[in-house]
Regions:
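Beta-strand-turn-beta hairpins that frame and shape the catalytic cleft
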Residues: 1-9, 103-113, 143-147, 209-212, ...
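N-terminal active-site segment of His-dependent metallophosphoesterases
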Residues: 1-64, 80-81, 99, 134, ...
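Active-site neighborhood of phospho(di)ester-bond hydrolases with catalytic His/Asp-centered motifs
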Residues: 11-12, 39-45, 69-75, 115, ...
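Active-site environment of divalent metal-dependent phosphoester hydrolases
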Residues: 17-19, 48-53, 57, 75-83, ...
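Extended active-site neighborhood of metal-dependent phosphoesterases/phosphodiesterases
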Residues: 56-137, 177-179, 208, 236
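Short acidic, glycine-rich surface-loop motifs adjacent to enzyme active sites
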Residues: 144-159
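Conserved beta-sheet core of the metallophosphoesterase superfamily
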Residues: 164-240
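A short C-terminal boundary segment appended to hydrolase-like catalytic domains
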Residues: 238-287
């Protein structure tokens, strides 16, 4: 596998319209200038109540960050009034983003967005078979060097202390289909806490060595005081030809702090033993 390094910034659950923190925007802009991501991903719940003005503010904020943005909807991004929820489900989201299942591709990165929101479900979500086929068809078009990424709102794994939120429906089937399609990285949000794992850490897979990393971004919106363990945060992925490194950043009242680093192998080659610093800030140089 050949290819250059690239970086991807993953935000989720902005919940624009609910207790916003005005210092987030300049702090995030400064961090983006340092790490220079190729793409910003927003994995749903951009708004708190799915209102047109909230969608507009969320889109303006994300576009102001000066990088390409790929966004998928979350369960909070559709109307809460019953009639509009079923007749104009994604109208306001699509007014800003054109589609609920966007695609981004370059020589280093190939990203497929999937819409897991179902209007008849208040919290949980699902992915249909035709959506899985859609993802497989697009991932098959990726450059040989590209990191293959799938994004949806509802989680496939979750933090063990937040198990009460249901993951995406038929998650084992969804995961297996995306892995078979070649996804190396599957991103989501929804639970407002960071979680990540390589599929072999939670799933017995016989005679199969393909590595797939599943990651959940902590929410960027206001933490809810009645929910234990929530913090504002985001994830940064640094992809190189043989490795994927995930950096977790948490907002600490007035700035972003690096709190964790995990490193995963890419492709089918086993990762050679190598010492990794416990905490190492991303280089300020670009990819």
């Amino acid at each position: 596998m050949s290819g250059a390094r690239t970086r991807l910034l993953h935000l989720s659950d902005l919940h624009v319209g609910s207790r916003e923190e005005p210092r987030i925007e300049p702090g995030l802009a400064a961090l983006i200038n340092r790490i220079e991501p190729e793409l910003i991903i927003a994995s749903g719940d951009l708004t708190h109540r799915g209102r047109p003005e909230q969608h507009e503010r969320a889109a303006d904020f994300l576009r102001s960050l000066g990088r390409p943005v790929l966004a998928v909807p979350g369960n909070h991004d559709i109307p809460y009034t019953p009639i509009a929820r079923f007749t104009r489900t994604f109208e306001h989201f699509e007014h800003q983003w054109k589609t609920t299942e966007p695609i981004y591709h370059s020589d280093q990165l190939h990203v497929v967005g999937l819409n897991s929101v179902r209007p008849w479900r208040h919290q949980s979500g699902g992915i249909r078979q035709d959506q899985l086929e859609h993802a497989a068809n697009h991932l098959a078009e990726a450059a040989s060097s590209a990191l293959r990424v799938v994004v949806l709102h509802h989680h496939l794994i979750g933090a063990p202390w937040r198990s009460r939120k249901k993951p995406v429906s038929r998650r084992s089937h969804v995961l297996a289909a995306l892995v078979d399609a070649g996804a190396e990285l599957i991103l989501a949000g929804h639970i407002h806490q960071a979680a990540m794992s390589e599929r072999h850490e939670f799933e017995v897979v016989s005679r199969e060595v393909r590595g797939t990393t599943v990651a959940i971004a902590p929410g960027l919106g206001q933490p809810r005081p009645d929910r234990r363990g929530e913090a504002r945060g985001m994830l940064v992925y640094e992809s190189e030809p043989s490795t994927l490194t995930v950096h977790t950043y948490i907002w600490r009242e007035d700035d972003w702090g690096l709190t964790a680093i995990r490193r995963f192998p890419r492709g089918r080659e086993p990762l050679a033993p190598q010492s990794t610093p416990a905490a190492e800030e991303l280089s300020t140089s670009g990819p």
